[in-house]
Amino acid sequence: MNSATDSARPHDQIRPVEIECGYLESNPASVLYKSGKTIVLCTASVETNVPPWMEGRGKGWVTAEYNMLPGSTSPRKRRDRSGKVDGRTTEIQRLIGRSLRAIVDLHALGERSITVDCDVLQADGGTRTASITGGYIALSLAVSQLAAIPELDPPVDPTAVLRDSVAAISVGVIGEDVVLDLDYRLDSAADVDMNVIMTGSGRFIELQGTGEEATFDDVQLAELLRLGKIGIAELTKLQKAQLVTV
């Protein structure tokens, strides 16, 4: 059934995904992540220190920054001025950071910081979910590179640092249909939209569901979650396939 999408894509199918690891020569822990027409560049950078409030606690920190380039949307999105970040950007980068930290053992990381930067090059809906899914791949690449440094003290065990994987997808209710992976057009038409963030092992990290001048019932919620799980499972397979080849 594709009546809700009015397109060739079935309501329970994700958009085409393309992943290119090592996209930047300057940072091997970089990922160009494409979900349909949405394109996000995710990079992970490691520092050998932690924020002042975490010093001496024997654990590391993972955080994220999110930004949309002016040309990523039409009309042009204005740049944040003088380092000031707007409310939407703050909310999204906190979500990305929380989602990534949920699967990281900060003690196993040691007193090191990893910043995952997610820069939206082109936006067509789902930029925050694409940032989380691509950001995890960049994070995994950075942790693997740390582990490859023989003189590192203490050493890093990737399997200890990364306890699981994480991916995110959007779902929504449009008319009578529940739809997976909303692009901008579908998101604009949705009566209800939800972001589903889950681990690769099938545990929930965060759910963000909202009715737009509408409500939804238990049956619709169950279907939203069912489709979300389908999408997460597919994205997890794609993540694993990419990381195996790196």
Swiss-Prot record:
Source organism superkingdom: Bacteria
EC category: transferase
GO MF annotation terms: 3'-5'-RNA exonuclease activity; RNA binding; tRNA binding; tRNA nucleotidyltransferase activity
Coiled coil: none
Sequence positions that bind phosphate: 88, 126-128
Reaction catalysis annotation: tRNA(n+1) + phosphate = tRNA(n) + a ribonucleoside 5'-diphosphate
Keyword terms of this UniProt record: Nucleotidyltransferase, RNA-binding, rRNA processing, Transferase, tRNA processing, tRNA-binding
Pfam families: RNase_PH (PF01138), RNase_PH_C (PF03725)
Example of a GO biological process term: tRNA processing
Signal peptide span: none
EC number from the UniProt entry: 2.7.7.56
SUPFAM superfamilies referenced in this protein's UniProt entry, alphabetically: Ribonuclease PH domain 2-like, Ribosomal protein S5 domain 2-like
Region (Disordered): 67-87
Functional summary from the UniProt entry: Phosphorolytic 3'-5' exoribonuclease that plays an important role in tRNA 3'-end maturation. Removes nucleotide residues following the 3'-CCA terminus of tRNAs; can also add nucleotides to the ends of RNA molecules by using nucleoside diphosphates as substrates, but this may not be physiologically important. Probably plays a role in initiation of 16S rRNA degradation (leading to ribosome degradation) during starvation.
Assembly description: Homohexameric ring arranged as a trimer of dimers.
Protein name: Ribonuclease PH
Organism of derivation: Rhodopirellula baltica (strain DSM 10527 / NCIMB 13988 / SH1)
